[in-house]
Amino acid sequence: MLSWKNDLTPVSDRFDDIYFSPENGLEETRHVFIGGNDLPDRWRNSNIQNPFCILELGFGTGLNFFATWKEYLKQDNRFRLHFISVEKFPLSRKEISKAVSAFPELEEIKEEFLSSYQDLIPGMNYFRFLEGKIHLTLFLGDVSDALCEISGKADAIFLDGFAPSKNPEMWEESVLGNLKNVSKFGTTFSTFTVARTVRNSLSYAGFTLEKRPGFGKKREMLTGKYSNYPSETKESLPKEKPWCKRSDPESQIKTATIIGAGIAGSTLAYSLSKRGIQVFLIDPSGIANETSGIPRAISHPHLTKIPGPISLFTLRAFRYALSFLSSFADKDQFGKVGSFHGVTAEMNPERFRKSIENHKLTEEIASWKPNGSDFHKNDPFNKELEEGVLFRNGFWTRPGSIARKCVDQPGIELIQATANSFERIGSSWKLDLKESDQKVLADSIIFCNSYLIGKLASSLFEGEEIFPINKVRGQLISLKETENSSRVPNILCAEHYLTPSVQGEHVLGSTFDEFDLNPKPRKKDTDLLLQYVQTKYPTLRFDSNCVLSEKTGFRAQTPDRFPIIGPIFDPKIFQETYKEIDLPRNRNKKFPNLKVIPGLYVFGGLGSRGILSSFLGAEILASLILGEPAPVEFSLLESLHPARFLYRRIRK
């Protein structure tokens, strides 16, 4: 809860402390944090391949972020700015708007931020502004948890929690000591407090300290630099998963070859091109002309009863995709209509309710709608629905159209040919193509070619397939709207899904068949889908005359139904290095942090959540390729890591 001092300065009732100086909060920010870290002078030396990262403890009203954004706009050289902030008690849109309204020069920035400040979830929330020049990762939760999950290194640190006397937990020695794990030699910090306990903790963590004149009535403030060279840990214990340790690229990445121009490859091409990378996009069939070419796809989070990798990833992917598409997609490419998921044998009422409760989700994300709720009463069609979960901002997309728009960017060259063979030449990769005499040379190669990833990559490893990606058939149908179906407001999900009518057409999908590789539509699948919709929603009055078209496609699915995103190891070296890592006697033995194959990455196994996963997945992989802070927790990077399948082989 907030109170207001003189109706202008926000005061936290929880901590009985002000969020910023009543004298002039914006000038205080500029003096203590922007000036305290010497940002204007340092930024003159940044370039597009060296993004600048700021870590902030205490997002509060967002004033420091807005002021930093404003300062960034003064720079002629628009490098990428990563701003990572931690906030345990986030303010509402209304509270932030009122607090920052005291500074009219920030109005435009504030409004752009607030347009994306929604659908928030515990943990990391990722935002992009200024066409990808500014990246904000907002961690909602405890600062101790946040510092364990940040995977990048900061160039500057803003320590801006409430006063140590008011909020001692944020200033504990264990918290400030962990700053060394997110710092590099020369990382600066600044803070308004010069409390002895803070000085001692920062000094012990390896920071040199300097007192400077404070702002306004504060006589002094504190700045400093991380003066240690972080020792490169070359070995780790088995429980630390040594194969997951991040390492920066060995050389500067300027070019990338992406194999596969479906939704995964197209979104990755977009993310890399926005970072100044020249992209060669290889696909014999063109852009999204295989499974990604379905007429419409639907997206909402997949909730498990207990928070785990799948639900945590899909929640983050959903809110980022929603934010990205809301500003990127054209009206006929994307529709935020809400998605209602009815009860099924797998998702019973207890599981649904517990999922929402255990993930601490607000109604912006998901809410349980029992029979007789306002959701059912307020719409004539909804009265016929059973109880279930409403994902208020569930959405549909036209994947093919979105993919083509992603690729229609400067710096992306589409080559319609088949990848044939690979060769490492110096620090680059050469790709030979079928159906083309063109030789492609790039700093990195990324496999995004769906269920063919394992087969194509195996040519690098003497025919050994290291990615167990299965080909799973699905069929959907397009239906002409009926008088009744034209009034359906939401996506309807249960055993199958039905989109609302768009331009007189519904999409009903999808079947799931792991053992049939027939690429042609089958009448029995069309009949199955029709029978489902007629039984589930009889008042919509669909019949066989409503069928406009049928389409089959093949999902690329991993055994754990989780994407593969990250670098690639040599399987033989991995086996030899870690073959005894799981033996009980080696529990306390350290193993080498194995180096990945330089410039080789994979992005696939998205299964039935291709659209949902692609946008955030592309940002994750772009950050790994270029050595940037990742937009998700380190624990999620571990779960997504391609080497998990090599490790499971060893355990067998």
Swiss-Prot record:
It catalyses: 5-aminomethyl-2-thiouridine(34) in tRNA + S-adenosyl-L-methionine = 5-methylaminomethyl-2-thiouridine(34) in tRNA + S-adenosyl-L-homocysteine + H(+). It is found in: Cytoplasm. It comes from the Bacteria. Keywords: Cytoplasm, FAD, Flavoprotein, Methyltransferase, Multifunctional enzyme, Oxidoreductase, S-adenosyl-L-methionine, Transferase, tRNA processing. GO terms for biological process: methylation; tRNA wobble base modification. Its main location: cytoplasm. Residues 259-652 are annotated as: FAD-dependent cmnm(5)s(2)U34 oxidoreductase. InterPro entries: FAD-dep_OxRdtase (IPR006076), FAD/NAD-bd_sf (IPR036188), MnmC-like_methylTransf (IPR008471), SAM-dependent_MTases_sf (IPR029063), tRNA_MAMT_biosynth_bifunc_MnmC (IPR023032), tRNA_MNMC2 (IPR047785), tRNA_S-uridine_synth_MnmC_C (IPR017610). The keyword Flavoprotein applies. Its EC number is 2.1.1.61, 1.5.-.-. GO terms for molecular function: flavin adenine dinucleotide binding; oxidoreductase activity, acting on the CH-NH group of donors; tRNA (5-methylaminomethyl-2-thiouridylate)(34)-methyltransferase activity. Residues 1-227 are annotated as: tRNA (mnm(5)s(2)U34)-methyltransferase. Its cofactor is FAD. SUPFAM superfamilies: FAD-linked reductases, C-terminal domain, FAD/NAD(P)-binding domain. GO terms for cellular component: cytoplasm. Catalyzes the last two steps in the biosynthesis of 5-methylaminomethyl-2-thiouridine (mnm(5)s(2)U) at the wobble position (U34) in tRNA. Catalyzes the FAD-dependent demodification of cmnm(5)s(2)U34 to nm(5)s(2)U34, followed by the transfer of a methyl group from S-adenosyl-L-methionine to nm(5)s(2)U34, to form mnm(5)s(2)U34. HAMAP family: MnmC. In the N-terminal section; belongs to the methyltransferase superfamily. tRNA (mnm(5)s(2)U34)-methyltransferase family. This is tRNA 5-methylaminomethyl-2-thiouridine biosynthesis bifunctional protein MnmC. It comes from Leptospira borgpetersenii serovar Hardjo-bovis (strain JB197).
